[in-house]
């Protein structure tokens, strides 16, 4: 008898996938957190974004090579299951789920703060609760509708960044808003020099900058729902990282060139100041709206990922089969519902803890180490993937470059970043939280004998 159970649907086009990845990566960290890294490194933070982007490029090309031959939902978690061991597939899926849950809770916390800009008397838990409801509705819709919602969410902040870069270049080269006098590049070398924070400040900022790229691998999560995945995913992998790199580096370049780096953050958001520079008096309200949608977009992308990770775990028999339930619209409804429920519980922190900054910092920082696990897994899995696909690799149109040396050097770089996090007081606790979480899920794996549950399944053809 044929199995007519609903399955995930391939309803995502290239533009949806690209904007889902952009939406998940470019979050409130760029709009609100630029001042932190500049405080440590000064203008050299530009170099930190470029270096981190280079290594993330190698990671993405490795993932793209595997996605072309095996476009499955769960992506790197499934590859870990197949090419490393069921345990690493399990650990990867839970680590990525935990990362996005932490990011999601921090994003809805931020939403409460942004709404108070217009309604200062409103309790922050109210807009946080409304945000959870909106994200739930978007993620329980058919995947194509979800893709459209996230496309427009992400488009708002992408457009804002582009406009900000264009305005900034006008100020730098043509003196817009500066009496016609071009500002030039003096702010990059004055006020302590390009490496104003020294090498220690640069390396400290580099650790945080690496974390800002987390989310770019969301492309892999969409693989099982992409139309014509070989073409769509190849295009998305090739475009997304370059766009993110341009947006990050372009925005930071404009900010540190227009304003002295040691004044950024003391007079408000650098994005607000850039728009205000050319006389846009409503700049604060505009940017507040943009960061509000940025937070919604980041949370929306995160819940999409969380639902698919729980689905992948259930398919690999590492969660109850009920978690693999798919609605008639092709949505992994059980995984999404559980993730939304925990997000709802997390939103209660906004009621319990009145200081939103404490909630945001504690929760967001806890996501960094679990978010790096998929990167290590992608690089290691590809080493074994190559051996399993020798014949196909010879004619592969999207092979990664500098293999295998790029894999080894990138892993060494990520290890150095983790070591740097330990020696930085601002990030040490987040490292410990990540380690505790990974030890906890490992203990559950052993205690419940999840290693006895079958071998990997091919989720999607």
UniProtKB/Swiss-Prot annotation:
Catalysed reactions, semicolon-separated: L-threonine(in) + H(+)(in) = L-threonine(out) + H(+)(out); L-serine(in) + H(+)(in) = L-serine(out) + H(+)(out)
Pfam families associated with the record: AA_permease
Keywords (A to Z) from UniProt: Amino-acid transport, Cell inner membrane, Cell membrane, Membrane, Transmembrane, Transmembrane helix, Transport
One GO BP annotation of this record: L-serine transport
Periplasmic compartment residues: 38-39, 118-122, 177-200, 265-277, 354-359, 422-429
Keyword Ribonucleoprotein on entry: no
Residues on Cytoplasmic side: 1-16, 61-96, 144-155, 222-243, 299-332, 381-400, 451-461
TM region positions: 17-37, 40-60, 97-117, 123-143, 156-176, 201-221, 244-264, 278-298, 333-353, 360-380, 401-421, 430-450
Membrane topology: Multi-pass membrane protein
GO cellular component: plasma membrane
Molecular function as annotated in GO: L-serine transmembrane transporter activity; L-threonine transmembrane transporter activity
Activity regulation text: Activity is inhibited by CCCP, a proton gradient uncoupler, but is insensitive to monensin.
Location in the cell: Cell inner membrane
Family the UniProt entry places it in: Belongs to the amino acid-polyamine-organocation (APC) superfamily.
Biological role: Permease that mediates the proton-dependent threonine and serine uptake. Shows higher specificity for threonine. Cannot transport homoserine.
Protein's recorded name: Threonine/serine transporter ThrP
């Amino acid at each position: 008898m044929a199995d007519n159970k609903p399955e995930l649907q391939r309803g995502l086009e290239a533009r949806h996938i690209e904007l889902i990845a952009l939406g998940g990566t470019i979050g409130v960290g760029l709009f609100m957190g630029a001042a932190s890294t500049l405080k440590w490194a000064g203008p050299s933070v530009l170099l930190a974004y470029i270096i981190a982007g280079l290594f993330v490029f190698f990671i993405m090309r490795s993932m793209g090579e595997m996605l072309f031959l095996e476009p499955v939902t769960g992506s790197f978690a499934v590859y870990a299951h197949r090419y490393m061991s069921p345990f690493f597939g399990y650990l990867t899926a839970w680590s990525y789920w935990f990362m996005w849950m932490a990011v999601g809770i921090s994003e809805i916390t931020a939403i409460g703060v942004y709404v108070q800009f217009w309604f200062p008397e409103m309790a922050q838990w109210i807009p946080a609760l409304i945000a959870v409801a909106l994200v739930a509705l978007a993620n329980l819709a058919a995947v194509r509708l979800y893709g459209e919602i996230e496309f427009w969410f992400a488009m708002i902040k992408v457009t804002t960044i582009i406009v900000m870069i264009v305005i900034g270049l006008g100020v730098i080269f043509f003196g817009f808003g500066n009496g016609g006098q071009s500002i030039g590049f003096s702010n990059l070398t004055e006020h302590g020099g390009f490496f104003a924070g020294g090498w220690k400040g640069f390396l400290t900022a580099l650790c945080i900058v690496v974390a800002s790229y987390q989310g770019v691998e969301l492309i892999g999560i969409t693989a099982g729902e992409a139309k014509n995945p070989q073409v769509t995913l190849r295009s998305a992998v090739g475009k997304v990282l370059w766009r993110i790199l341009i947006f990050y580096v372009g925005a930071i370049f404009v900010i540190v060139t227009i304003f002295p780096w040691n004044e950024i953050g003391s007079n408000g958001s650098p994005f607000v100041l850039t728009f205000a520079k050319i006389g846009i008096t409503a700049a604060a309200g505009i940017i507040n709206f943009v960061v509000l949608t940025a937070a919604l977009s980041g949370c929306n992308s995160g819940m999409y990922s969380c639902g698919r990770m729980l689905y992948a775990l259930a398919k690999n028999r590492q969660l109850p089969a009920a978690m693999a339930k798919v609605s008639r619209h092709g949505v992994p409804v059980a995984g999404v519902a559980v993730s939304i429920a925990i997000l709802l519980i997390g939103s209660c922190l906004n009621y319990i803890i009145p200081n939103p900054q404490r909630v945001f910092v504690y929760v967001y920082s806890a996501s960094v180490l679990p978010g790096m696990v998929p990167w290590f897994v992608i690089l290691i899995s590809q080493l074994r993937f190559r051996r399993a696909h020798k014949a196909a690799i010879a004619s592969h149109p999207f092979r990664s470059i500098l293999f295998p040396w790029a894999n080894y050097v990138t892993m060494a770089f990520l290890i150095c970043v983790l070591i740097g996090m330990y020696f930085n007081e601002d990030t040490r606790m987040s490292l410990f939280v990540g380690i505790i979480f990974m030890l906890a899920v490992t203990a559950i794996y052993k205690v419940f004998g999840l290693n006895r549950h079958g071998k990997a399944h091919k989720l999607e053809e």
